[in-house]
């Protein structure tokens, strides 16, 4: 085929579509399709036409047609102007930074109203006796029994309702607020049941802040700091999380070892209702400690009456220092005694 004739045709098309090419309204391949459609006898296929378009617009990258008046070389800047990325809806979940230089009592998995009164009171008394001024509630303070996706026992409605559970949780929060200088409430997967229940059964109301659990519990009113279930906290060099935030942490050894395999940094968690500790060093000489705390709920729930085989009552104190280091007392509670 006469190359000159092909070139003249391509240049004419480029001239006719110059503005659209510059604005990104048509691609070189799109222009090649138009050329091939009108001149199928001159070009073998669309790709042949596209090669000619690239050659005569100076985009082929081999120095061909350097003097072409229609040089339309692709650039990142041009692409950004012609085609903008869609706005992302992703929200950056920044870590919650806890103040160092203080001593914390860490409680998790109380599961009101299925709490163990003796174990819970013992944990609070022990924390105060050890000089803890801050209380960190590390998730699953309330059970949210009536908002679960699992089958519930309808007979229990005679004993307590959603309102009962909310009121008991508020009563507990008001109580601990008198015992400590500062209370933090990190939501766990059981608190998250509330939001999921609204989405599924009352989606028209779920966008109203009034129905957010942290507002129903009046946390801000009582100066209790709320931390969402999808955020983790950092206390110096110690990461604190409920335990549901990351999948695949099960370990046949213990929860602490399973979380170490995932986090690879010093971490404290609840969720598994089991006291365990895993210590390991790194090749750089750093020391890592991972701690899973026991629970403060019944050890014989209806859905798992032998849970006490693996579960145990327990909590932890963490003394944090200004340099980010920390000291942990991951204690068990047996018959009301903190060990």
Language-model-detected regions and their locations in the chain:
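Active-site-proximal loop/helix segment associated with metal-binding centers of metalloenzymes
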Residues: 201-239, 243, 250-253, 292-297
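Conserved beta-sheet core of the metallophosphoesterase superfamily
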Residues: 241-331, 336
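Structural motif
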Residues: 102-104, 134-136, 238-239, 266-268
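Short, charged amphipathic recognition helices of the HTH superfamily
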Residues: 14-39
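Core catalytic region of metal-dependent phosphoesterases/phosphodiesterases
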Residues: 107, 112-220
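Major-groove recognition helix of helix-turn-helix-like DNA-binding domains
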Residues: 29, 41-73
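Mobile, glycine- and charge-enriched loop segments
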Residues: 79-117, 235-236
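Basic, short loop/linker segments at the boundary and entry of helix-turn-helix/winged-helix-like folds
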Residues: 1-17
